[in-house]
Every structure is written in C-alpha cells, then in structure tokens.
Amino acid sequence: MKKTIIVFIILAFMLNCKNKSNDAEPNNDLDEKSQAKSNLVDEDRIEFSKATPLEKLVSRLNLNNTEKETLTFLTNLLKEKLVDPNIGLHFKNSGGDESKIEESVQKFLSELKEDEIKDLLAKIKENKDKKEKDPEELNTYKSILASGFDGIFNQADSKTTLNKLKDTI
C-alpha cells in the first residue's frame, strides 16, 4: 500500500512539472503578431518601472538630443569624480553611492525652471566642446564642474547652486 501511494505521488509530481514546463512555452494557437504584441506590452511595463526619477524628469522636459547628451555627460562626470579625493567636501556626502548622484541631480534640476536647465546645459556643452580638444583641459573642466556641483550634495538651495555654477563655468 505504501509503495502504491509513493508511486502515485511521484507520478503526480512529474505530471505537475510537465504541465508547468508546457505553460512556459508560447501558446502555438496564437499567431506571431499577437505574441509579439503581448511581449511588447510586458517589456514596456518592465522598462517603465525601471525608470529612475532623473529619467522621469528628463522625459517630462522638452530637451533635445544634444541637451540630453550634455546631461548624461554631466551625470557621468559627477559619478567619475565621486572617487576623486580632491573634489569638494559635500560631494562625499553621497556616501560613494552613484544612485545618490542621480537623485541629487534630479532634485537640483526639478527645482529649476526649464529655461534655466536648458541655459545651464547649453553653457556646459559650449565649454565642454571648447575644452575637448585638449584632454588635460577637459579633465580640469570636469573637476571645476564637479566642484561647482558640490553644493547640491550639501542640500543647498538650487538657485544658489545655479548662480555659483554660472560664475564657475
């Protein structure tokens, strides 16, 4: 009797596993177009949920590709300078966490008007383009820019930091 029960449990388990693996396969009854459409919906949901607050802010702003590239340059240089011991004291308040940098940049930008953001990005791009010919000048500019952004990691007022940046860059 015990053997019969054990064999029955094993068979039930094997059937259950087989049914689960069949569910994982795409339904052959559906045409390819509807399967592709279904996959797109799932991918969009996943991507939307992965968007950072900075990405969400950028999507709400009317930034052109050049401005988006400049913002990416700025964010990446701040992440790069995070490990530099010569950067400002408050910059280290991020605790070495790169996500804190994006969070701080997002907070800083969200307190500014769209035209102020565009002006700032245009000025950064203009100076970056001038300095790009000489790697040493570009690195110096990156350090100056990172030092100028030191105030956003001290929870300083965005307008104050913006005015300081205008003088710096």
Curated annotation (Swiss-Prot):
GO CC terms: cell outer membrane; membrane
Q: Which domain of life is it from?
A: Bacteria
Please give, as recorded in its UniProt entry, the membrane topology of this protein: Peripheral membrane protein
**Keyword line:** Cell outer membrane, Membrane, Plasmid
UniProt entry tagged with the keyword RNA-binding: no
Would the keyword Membrane turn up in this protein's UniProt record? yes
Q: Where in the cell is it found?
A: Cell outer membrane
Q: What is its main location?
A: membrane
State what protein this is by name.
Putative outer membrane protein BBA03
The species this protein was found in: Borreliella burgdorferi (strain ATCC 35210 / DSM 4680 / CIP 102532 / B31)
